[in-house]
């Protein structure tokens, strides 16, 4: 099944000022994360950023900071353990439901998340990305953007991708996400997105 912009949310994990310089192919990863954020903004895909211990690792890099609301600050390696699931559910679930206001909560039909596809980019792939994805997979369809994630070493990054694939996460690339969001060359944002990748 193709990734739909109307059912997607983009999560940028820990792309922080003091962490990025130590990352394998960090500049390329940042460029792809920025492409995702720019396309997400064009297509009205909600963007969430996380920050791991910002007092020590710095804040989200300036290139990405303006694309999302306040970052989810965390100490757990898995953002799913520090409020990300609730945040994504709040963003993707409409406030209205078909339940009568007087109906007891235990009888009410749960509201479905209208944005269950989570697109993940960030660092480090074998720590915070991996643990966050594992924590999200029970509730969401998770797509890990392999050319927008990294670790300090290539070996750790690749081991994370092997494990994530074995666990059932969808491994994609930046261009796969962008072109699936577009579907065809007649999309109103096709030329703008095409400029992002040339």
Predicted regions and their residues:
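Active-site-adjacent betaalpha module
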Residues: 2-6, 57-198
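A short alpha/beta connector and helix-capping loop motif
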Residues: 5-8, 23-54
């Amino acid at each position: 099944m193709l990734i739909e912009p109307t059912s997607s949310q983009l999560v940028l994990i820990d792309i922080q000022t003091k962490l990025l310089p130590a990352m394998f192919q960090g500049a390329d990863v940042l460029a792809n994360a920025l492409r995702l954020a720019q396309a997400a903004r064009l297509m009205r895909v909600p963007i969430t950023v996380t920050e791991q211990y910002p007092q020590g690792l710095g804040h989200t890099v300036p290139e990405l900071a303006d694309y999302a609301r306040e970052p989810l600050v965390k100490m757990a390696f898995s953002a799913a353990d520090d409020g990300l699931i609730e945040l994504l559910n709040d963003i993707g679930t409409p406030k209205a439901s078909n339940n009568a206001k007087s109906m007891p909560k235990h009888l009410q039909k749960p509201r479905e998340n209208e944005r269950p596809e989570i697109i993940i980019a960030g660092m480090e792939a074998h720590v915070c990305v991996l643990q966050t994805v594992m924590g999200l997979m029970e509730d969401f369809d998770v797509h890990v953007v392999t050319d927008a994630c990294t670790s300090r070493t290539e070996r750790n990054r690749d081991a994370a991708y092997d494990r994530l694939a074995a666990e059932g996460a969808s491994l994609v690339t930046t261009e796969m996400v962008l072109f699936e969001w577009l579907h065809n060359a007649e999309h109103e944002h096709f030329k703008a997105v095409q400029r992002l990748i040339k």
